[in-house]
Amino acid sequence: MSDNSAAVLSNNLIYSAMIFYTLAFFAHAVEVAWSVKTPANSVKKTKLDFSRTDRIGRLASAFMVLGFLLLLPGVIFRGVSANRVPWGNMYEFSITGALAFSAAYLFALKKYKLRWLGLPVALSVLLTLGTAVTLLYRPSAPLMPALKSPWLVIHVSAAIISGGVFLLANCIAATYLMIDRYEQKGLRPVWAEKLPSLEALDNLSYRLVALVFPLWTFSVIAGAIWAEAAWGRYWGWDPKETWAFITWVAYAAYLHARVTIGWRGRKAAWLCLLAGSTFLFNYIYVNVWGTGRHTYSGL
């Protein structure tokens, strides 16, 4: 297969994946709408209502799986077209990041039954891919000299996986805060009838961050080792390095507050979102508009 054919195939697969993520988004939206229309505690709720809502939810999950199964080879063939790993510019970071976020959700869907997160996850993946193919797209090209290193695979893969799980934990923390706002008034929103308790949401967000924080730590260390090999110094307070460290400190503070101080609930959720915002700032602003040796966006 020629490089051009691989590039075309990659583009087609990514567009096809977007179709299924769009279908998943609308199916999840219908599932939520039907749940709101007939609350779980309603005496008028029938077995047919439960069955109908469950079927559309299962269909939405199937669309999410199909989207992932198309996006995965789309990312792979992008690398084939460039004869390298597909992590050389913001377009490639974005499609791979969407893949990692989707994979983290599907893993959590299987292990923790998180179908209720499908709506925001599908929307986030769609927005990321839509931005990638419309604003960030660049033809396949060789890597910059500084990126030609085995550390690219080690460092970037760890960062992408960490980011996908961090963002999933942030979605759960945001859901916690939305429900908590209602429950402070003695209410529980209709759309949250089937969701886990606040305590379960709080614990799940914490478990995801605790699970992936060591990998993020490894990513930061691997980046420093790579910097020494490429530029002759381990740390130079480049904007990208600085914000990666800030993200590490923020999530470390979150874990410390949970384990040592005993923070739970609202305060922990806000701290989790704050940590996630530092990651997104680094990923979006620093990559696109930042200056320094880590400016690889290709824009």
Residues covered by each model-derived region:
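Polytopic transmembrane helical bundles with strong interfacial aromatic enrichment
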Residues: M1-L299
